[in-house]
Amino acid sequence: HELLQQTRHVRDDATSAAQVAVGQHRPLSQREMMSVLSLLQATPSATLQAAIGDDDESLAQRLKNEVLSSATRLGVDPATATLDPMDEDAIDLIGMLFDVMLDERDLKNRSRDMIGRLVVPFVKVALLDRQIFVQKTHPARRLLNALAEACEGNSGDSASDRVLMGKVEEIVDRLVAEFNESLAIFLTLEEEFRDRSEERRVGKECRSRWSP
């Protein structure tokens, strides 16, 4: 919370200065935000992908810049467009969540790329349902944790590890392709992935039990 407060202070100072310089800005509506995020979800920019896991750049700031620049594709005037403070908070929090996950977990390059593809969909979730930040059992959080756990330390050395990584990629592909504004897909994919992970866990226990 302290980090978010510091981010707000810096952001508010920058916003005030910008408004003095160019006049009153108009925050993007939620409909515009969702439309822009859907564009980024379908075709993420190279600069946003490069910012994922980059210690020298804030993922949240890069995402906010991408949202504003992509809003021009909807006919929004870039000279007056800005973000609603609550939307900025949501992006900041999601950015922090992924920054911490990518920094603290042992994720290989392929895993980092797959987890990074979830950033934009999760910003959409945050705009639709703020409970994601306070409800640990939120389906989107459960799915993200399950995917990250499956990827952590997984170099694909064994056949079962490769199969699991393939399933992670399948889940990510489906989420990116199918998620619009219905959160039900997170519950469906989380249950499906949990079943596959349980099969792998039982299989590993059986092999360990019977190995010499």
Model-derived regions: residue spans:
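Extended, low-complexity, amphipathic alpha-helical coiled-coil/linker regions that act as scaffolds
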Residues: H1-R207
